[in-house]
A protein has these predicted regions:
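A generic, well-ordered mixed alpha/beta core segment in the N-terminal half of proteins
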Residues: 21, 26-62
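Histidine-centered, transition-metal-coordinating active-site segments
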Residues: 1-16, 46-251
């Protein structure tokens, strides 16, 4: 949300609106990110942007929802590539989200030993910078410079092209890396198993979600998705161990 607010402030847009959209649009993220989203979409229609809207409309405040403006809700729903936000603040959030993903995923890959700075093509480093932070700063400044006094939020052709090449590089060398892919497959399996368990054993759901089953006409599968989508990575692993991994026998 900080990147979105920084860009919105520099462009003299509504900073609070940009931050509200940025904070709200991640509420529907599942444990293990896109792997968790894929797992829930495999077993039940699930989209994290739609889930984010569901959280603020139907789940918060004991099911009463939040009284958000149309502009915030529009930005939350349309922050993905397929959507088109109707405000400049929504467009700022959508673009800054892409920049944040590149920054964090590359930083994680370098820290995890999957990549080194030297692996990144020299021409991309020449344009964007020689560190994760430098690349993020380059892209943020480029967005601000090229969007100032414009009717759309965009980057310069050179930096935009470099960013897309960097994302392509990340897909080929990180997201499709056998080590990362193996961990993703484990996460998909685990979330799928949890979903099946809770659908069969709704008594294991927390009271808030059991009450939702009785008091609303939402499908059982939707309520289970609501619960799982709100888990952290570590909590999902904990519940998986609780239900599927036998404890050591005390003899």
């Amino acid at each position: 949300s900080q990147n979105a607010r920084t860009i919105a402030k520099a462009l003299r847009l509504n900073e609070d609106l940009a931050e509200a959209i940025a904070l709200g649009h991640d509420l529907g993220h599942t444990p293990f990110g896109h792997a968790g989203e894929r797992a829930l979409n495999n077993v039940y229609h699930f989209s994290h942007s739609e889930q984010s809207l569901r959280v603020v409309d139907c789940i918060e405040k004991d099911g009463k929802g939040l009284n958000l403006t149309w502009e915030v809700r529009d930005g939350i729903l349309n922050h993905q590539t397929a959507g088109t936000p109707h405000t400049l603040e929504g467009a700022v959030v959508r673009l800054s989200d892409k920049l944040a993903y590149i920054y964090h995923d590359m930083d994680d890959a370098i820290r995890g030993g999957i990549l080194t700075e030297e692996d990144i093509p020299a021409e991309l480093r020449d344009i964007l910078g020689n560190s994760c932070k430098a690349r993020l700063n380059t892209m943020i400044h480029d967005v601000i410079t090229n969007s100032m006094d414009s009717l759309e939020v965009h980057m310069s052709p050179t930096v935009d092209r470099a960013m897309k090449e960097l994302r392509k590089f990340m897909f080929e060398n990180v997201y499709l890396n056998p080590k990362a892919k193996g961990e993703e497959d484990k996460a998909v399996h685990m979330i799928g198993q949890l979903f099946e368990y809770y659908v069969k054993h709704t008594e294991a759901l927390p009271k808030q979600f059991r009450d939702a089953l009785e008091e609303t006409d939402h499908a059982k599968e939707q309520i289970v998705c609501d619960y799982i989508a709100g888990m952290t990575d570590s909590y999902a692993v904990k519940k998986f161990h609780e239900y599927f991994v036998p404890g050591a026998w005390k003899i």
